[in-house]
C-alpha cells in the first residue's frame, strides 16, 4: 500500500499544482475520479497489467474516458501509461482529493458510534473537532454495535477512541503488563 502511495504522489502533486494554477481544481478532481473509476473497471484491469503497448493503452484509455477528461488530463494519462502507472490512478485521485482538502483547510472525519448520534451530538463533535484541528470538518458517520457504547473518531492522523470496547481493551492491556 505504501508503495502505491509513493508512486501516486508525484502524479497527484503535479496534477494538483497544475489545477491550482489553472483555477480548475474541482474539475480536475472530477476528471481524476472518473479516470480512476475507469481504471478500476474489471474489463480494463487486464489491460493495465502490461499486456498492451503503452501508446495503445493510453489511446484506448483516453478513448474510453471520452469527453469526460480534457486535453491536459489526457496528457497526464499518456505520461502515466508510458511509465506503466495507470494502475495507480485510484491512488492518484485519492491523493488529489486529500491535497484539495488540505489546501481548502478541510478534513474528513470518520465517526464510528455504537448507536446513531443526534444532530446536537454531531454538531458538538463538529465544533469541537474544528476547534482542535483548526480546519473545517466534514463528518462521515457509521454505526458499529460492537463498540458497546461511545465513539471512535478518525481525522487524518488523529484517532480518538472513546468507545467502551477500546477502554476495555486498554484496561486488559494494562492488567496484562
From Swiss-Prot:
It is a peripheral membrane protein. It is found in: Cell inner membrane. Pfam families: OSCP. Keywords: ATP synthesis, Cell inner membrane, Cell membrane, CF(1), Hydrogen ion transport, Ion transport, Membrane, Transport. It comes from the Bacteria. InterPro entries: ATP_synth_OSCP/delta_N_sf, ATPase_OSCP/dsu. Its main location: membrane. GO terms for cellular component: plasma membrane; proton-transporting ATP synthase complex. One of its GO terms (molecular function) is proton-transporting ATP synthase activity, rotational mechanism. PANTHER family: ATP SYNTHASE DELTA CHAIN. F(1)F(0) ATP synthase produces ATP from ADP in the presence of a proton or sodium gradient. F-type ATPases consist of two structural domains, F(1) containing the extramembraneous catalytic core and F(0) containing the membrane proton channel, linked together by a central stalk and a peripheral stalk. During catalysis, ATP synthesis in the catalytic domain of F(1) is coupled via a rotary mechanism of the central stalk subunits to proton translocation. Belongs to the ATPase delta chain family. F-type ATPases have 2 components, F(1) - the catalytic core - and F(0) - the membrane proton channel. F(1) has five subunits: alpha(3), beta(3), gamma(1), delta(1), epsilon(1). F(0) has three main subunits: a(1), b(2) and c(10-14). The alpha and beta chains form an alternating ring which encloses part of the gamma chain. F(1) is attached to F(0) by a central stalk formed by the gamma and epsilon chains, while a peripheral stalk is formed by the delta and b chains. This is ATP synthase subunit delta. It comes from Shewanella pealeana (strain ATCC 700345 / ANG-SQ1).
